[in-house]
Amino acid sequence: MQLAVNIDHIATLRNARNEQQPDPVTAAAIAELSGASGIVCHLREDRRHIKDRDLERLRESVTTKLDLEMAMTEEMQRIAIRTKPELITLVPEKREELTTEGGFDIISHYDRLAEFIKPVRDAGIEVSLFIEPEEKAVALAAKAGADIVEMHTGPYSLKKRPEDIDAEIKRIRIAASYARDSGLRVVAGHGLNYYNILPFRRIEEIEEVSIGHALIARAALAGMETAVRDMLHLINEA
């Protein structure tokens, strides 16, 4: 299983003092050198952490894969086509939220989704949708022309009772299997950490996990290299 590192909260820390450090681009380079298969950043409409210049510099420096998380807006579509990350991930976005709170509402947005996706894919950029692990959402993602679905693991990360955890893993596994059978690649993310990641090793359809807050929190104390290698050990060797 591969690991994509979300470096948004490096920018959050930098912006807390309106300084130049820590630098998300430097953090991304260390993550790549430590074994990360990709770098994820979310250019939010309010620019609360990653800024436009960060995205430009990341595009110039990332050597693995750059995944731009973004809202489904004309502005973000233009930015994506101009900067050409390897991949965009469409996510829901609310200004008042601390972090993304749920999967992309593909049912409500379906009528304009295929039209939005086509010029992005025509520019040579793959498209992923951050969705709830439900068969209907998977089917609509495939029909709209997505390449990848990212299973929203937030609800799983909040479960405490073993039976609830098992039920959520089963739900994710079923959706992931359906997605792969539908011709989609499957990744997973949101709320995953060093303590709840192990069950995902048993879901063979999931090729990559995307981890941000937990990994950056460990990096703040132990360093980015250690944080990345510790996670890679858990998902591949434990």
Curated annotation (Swiss-Prot):
Gene3D superfamilies named in the record: Aldolase class I
Enzyme category, top tier: transferase
Predominant place of localization: cytoplasm
Gene (name only): pdxJ
Lineage, opening ranks: Bacteria, Pseudomonadati, Chlorobiota, Chlorobiia, Chlorobiales
Organism: Chlorobium phaeobacteroides (strain BS1)
Domain of life: Bacteria
Subunit structure and binding partners: Homooctamer; tetramer of dimers.
EC numbers for this chain: 2.6.99.2
Name by which UniProt lists this protein: Pyridoxine 5'-phosphate synthase
Catalytic activity: 3-amino-2-oxopropyl phosphate + 1-deoxy-D-xylulose 5-phosphate = pyridoxine 5'-phosphate + phosphate + 2 H2O + H(+)
Function as written in the Swiss-Prot or TrEMBL entry: Catalyzes the complicated ring closure reaction between the two acyclic compounds 1-deoxy-D-xylulose-5-phosphate (DXP) and 3-amino-2-oxopropyl phosphate (1-amino-acetone-3-phosphate or AAP) to form pyridoxine 5'-phosphate (PNP) and inorganic phosphate.
